[in-house]
Amino acid sequence: MGKLKLKLNIDISKVLATQGGKQAMLVIDDSAIARKTLSRNLEYYGFEVIEADAGIAGLKLFLERQREIAIVILDMVLEDVQGEVVLAKLQQLDPEVKVVVCTESASTEFKQTGQKVAGVLRKPIATDRLLKVIHLALGGSAADVEA
C-alpha cells in the first residue's frame, strides 16, 4: 500500500499497522450499488473488504471475523433492521469497535443515544472524504489530512 494521492498526506499502511493485525473493513449496506462502489474504492487503496447486504448478515460476519476487522462502515437505513440496532449490537459485542455510519439524507441526523461512532459519512460518498474519515477513525493524525 502506498501513499494516497487525494489531497492527503496519509500512508494507510502505517495507520493499519497500529490496529493489532486487523486489516479488513466490514461494509454493511443493503444497496448493492452503494456497497460495491464503496468496496471497490476501498480495495483500490489496498483495504481488504468484507461485504454484508443486510444488518443481520453484517452482525454474523462481524462475529465470525471480528479479529480481522479494523473498522465497520454501516449504512443507517437497512431493510431488515435499523442501523441504530446494528450499531448497538456491534458495540455490545465489542465496546472498542470502530464504526463509521453512512446516511443518504442530509436532513437525517444521526442521534447519539449513548452510542459513539468513529465518523459519519453522507451519501453519495466522495472518495477523499471516505479516506479522511477512515484515517481519523483508525487513529491517524489530523495533521496528515489537508483542509
Regions found by a protein language model. Name each.
Residues 32-50:
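Two-component/phosphorelay signaling modules centered on CheY-like receiver
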Residues 123:
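A Lys-centered signature of the CheY-like receiver
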Residues 75:
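Active-site residues of response regulator receiver
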Residues 60-63, 84-96:
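Short amphipathic alpha-helix used as the core "switch/output" element in two-component signaling
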Residues 51-71:
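Acidic, metal-coordinating helix/loop segments flanking the phosphotransfer/catalytic sites
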Residues 79:
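The feature encodes the CheY-like receiver
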Residues 1-26, 39, 68, 116, ...:
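Non-catalytic signal-transmission and effector/linker regions of two-component phosphorelay proteins
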Residues 100-104:
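Hydrophobic/aromatic residues positioned on beta-strands within the core alpha/beta folds
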